[in-house]
């Protein structure tokens, strides 16, 4: 009796090839990475979140109200002066110092919940001296903060990259990966 031999691949061979293809695809993806602007924007969004968490810890440990002022190309933490109770830049801390982003990056903040600033307040704020400016976000000594949504935008040639940081009133932060917008 003659045995007829089956042709084809065994399950083990198929799984081995699939695993090798997956490893190669992973290696190629990791070596290519994302677009440079996208990576830089992601880095700055994570930096913002880390410094905000540091400011929350500072507020809790020191028992003080801390403010966050968002500008078009950066942010700055503030505290009230003991003398006149006016807001001033938080100094003496490298981590919580003023941050200036590249001109290609823009920040925009939307306050959630109640609106404690009107459009006329913002016009007045723009006309104020830098020393008299007030924060948009308050960080309370219990770690809570004013809820907000911060949008970071990076323009890179024909593509605009977006990252959104969302903060709730309990101080929890989330980084949302937004889709890229073609122009």
Curated annotation (Swiss-Prot):
Q: How does it sit in the membrane?
A: Single-pass membrane protein
Q: What does this protein do?
A: Component of the type II secretion system required for the energy-dependent secretion of extracellular factors such as proteases and toxins from the periplasm. Part of the pseudopilus tip complex that is critical for the recognition and binding of secretion substrates.
Name the Gene Ontology biological process terms: protein secretion by the type II secretion system
Write down what this protein is called.
Type II secretion system protein H
NCBIfam families attached to this UniProt entry: IV_pilin_GFxxxE (TIGR02532), typeII_sec_gspH (TIGR01708)
Q: Which organism is it from?
A: Aeromonas hydrophila
What quaternary arrangement does the UniProt entry report? Type II secretion is composed of four main components: the outer membrane complex, the inner membrane complex, the cytoplasmic secretion ATPase and the periplasm-spanning pseudopilus. Interacts with core component ExeG.
Per the record, the similarity remark reads: Belongs to the GSP H family.
Q: Where N-methylphenylalanine occurs along the chain?
A: 9
Q: How is it modified after translation?
A: Cleaved by prepilin peptidase.
């Amino acid at each position: 009796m003659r045995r007829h031999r089956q042709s084809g691949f065994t399950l083990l061979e198929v799984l081995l090839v699939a695993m090798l293809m997956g490893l190669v695809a992973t290696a190629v993806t990791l070596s290519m990475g994302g677009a440079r602007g996208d990576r830089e924007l992601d880095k700055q969004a994570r930096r913002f979140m880390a410094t905000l968490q540091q400011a929350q810890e500072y507020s809790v440990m020191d028992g003080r109200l801390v403010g966050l002022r968002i500008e078009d190309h950066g942010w700055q933490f503030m505290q009230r002066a003991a003398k006149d109770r006016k807001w001033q830049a938080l100094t003496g801390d490298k981590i919580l110092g003023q941050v200036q982003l590249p001109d290609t990056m823009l920040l925009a903040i939307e306050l959630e919940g109640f609106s404690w600033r009107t459009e006329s307040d913002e016009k007045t704020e723009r006309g104020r001296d830098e020393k008299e400016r007030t924060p948009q976000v308050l960080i309370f000594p219990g770690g809570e903060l004013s809820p907000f949504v911060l949008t970071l935008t990076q323009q890179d040639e024909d593509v605009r990259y977006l990252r959104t940081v969302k903060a709730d009133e309990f101080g929890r932060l989330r980084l949302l990966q937004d889709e890229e917008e073609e122009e």
